[in-house]
């Protein structure tokens, strides 16, 4: 929940900053002498400059054809997501300890928000970023790296072995393309204009229009995200559609399609790990339970679903599952990134 709140807050701040800066950028001009108007990346370069996602290299030049470093890309992701830069006294990587370096705070901020991971003690800030690293960092920055395992089977490229799930997600979100139908060239280094193209696509996805409606039944043609139907193993287990199901539904719906989420509050009684009873609740009943204060709260990051529960004297456990506004927004954001134009929520 905290992760989602930080991301949504950052995105709102980004919108305000960009809205205040676009007019000035247009007035001052953002043309670079080394980017021809007919170049395939001219639009991406221009808008990334106007949105303050990327700067030139000086002298009125963008640096067309130059490689993008990992540190520079981390900084652009901080700008894309609107993250407030952090500057801890000690760096998180052995090669990011100089607090005076221009990229120190960007690296630490990207690490704080999960775009960079601590799997290695090195972040290699001056290395040219590869295409697979760019896909991985972008998907993580957007907050959906958790789906990389699920998405791995969707990767259409035969030359990808290490980051299949991340590349599949970036491809599904329309952020990055292959060099051919079945080739991605994951180890190839990315140029500054290629990075600009990915950043602008991510920006456009994040700000795409998506309709949210609360309905009593799924509209015809809308793809419903499947909920868990078999309850077994440890409890509590959310009967809601997990993010994996929302991802699958959004992929089936396709660009411009719609997805339906089932979010009617559900009360379950379990004993010994077995569901012994269940019933749906009205919004009024849910509000009363949440206000009662005699139940413990829990949140499933995997399923993006909330619950409250209490233990009864007979050893059973009563659990009430529901979707909070933040839960719905997380799934809504995933659908937006995957090109869905409408989400219907059954409550």
Stretches with model-predicted labels:
Residues 49, 111-112, 171, 336:
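Alpha-helix C-terminal capping/helix-coil junction sites
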Residues 213-289:
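Substrate-binding surface in catalytic domains of secreted glycosidases
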Residues 218-222, 323-336:
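Short, acidic/polar
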Residues 331-347:
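Acidic/aromatic/glycine-rich contiguous surface patches that form carbohydrate-binding/processing clefts
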């Amino acid at each position: 929940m905290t992760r989602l709140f930080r991301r949504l807050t950052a995105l709102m701040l980004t919108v305000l900053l960009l809205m205040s800066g676009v007019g000035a950028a247009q007035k001052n001009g953002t043309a670079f002498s080394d980017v021809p108007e007919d170049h395939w990346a001219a639009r991406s370069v221009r808008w990334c400059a106007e949105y303050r996602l990327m700067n030139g290299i000086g002298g009125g030049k963008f640096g067309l054809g130059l490689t993008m470093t990992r540190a520079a890309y981390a900084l652009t992701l901080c700008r894309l997501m609107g993250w407030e830069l952090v500057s801890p006294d000690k760096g998180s990587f052995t090669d990011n300890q100089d607090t005076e370096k221009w990229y120190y705070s960007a690296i630490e901020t990207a690490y704080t928000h999960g775009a960079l991971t601590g799997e290695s003690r090195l972040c290699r800030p001056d290395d040219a970023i590869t295409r697979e690293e760019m896909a991985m960092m972008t998907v993580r920055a957007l907050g959906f790296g958790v789906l990389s395992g699920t998405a791995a089977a969707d990767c259409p490229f035969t030359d990808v072995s290490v980051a299949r799930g991340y590349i599949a997600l970036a491809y599904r979100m329309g952020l990055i393309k292959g060099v051919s139908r079945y080739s991605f060239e994951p180890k190839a280094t990315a140029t500054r204009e290629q990075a600009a193209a990915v950043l602008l696509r991510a920006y456009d996805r994040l700000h795409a229009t998506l309709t949210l409606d609360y309905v009593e039944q799924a509209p015809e043609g809308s793809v419903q995200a499947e909920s868990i139907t078999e309850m077994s193993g440890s409890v509590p287990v959310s009967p809601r559609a997990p993010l994996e199901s929302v991802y699958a539904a959004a992929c089936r719906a396709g660009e411009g399609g719609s997805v339906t989420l089932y979010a009617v509050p559900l009360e379950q009684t379990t004993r010994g790990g077995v569901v012994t009873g269940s019933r749906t609740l009205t919004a009024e009943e849910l509000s009363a339970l949440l206000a009662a204060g005699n139940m413990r709260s829990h949140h499933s990051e995997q399923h993006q679903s909330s619950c409250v529960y209490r233990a009864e004297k007979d050893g059973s456990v009563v659990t009430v599952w529901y979707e909070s506004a933040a839960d719905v927004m997380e799934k809504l954001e995933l659908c937006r990134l995957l090109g869905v134009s409408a989400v219907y929520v059954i409550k």
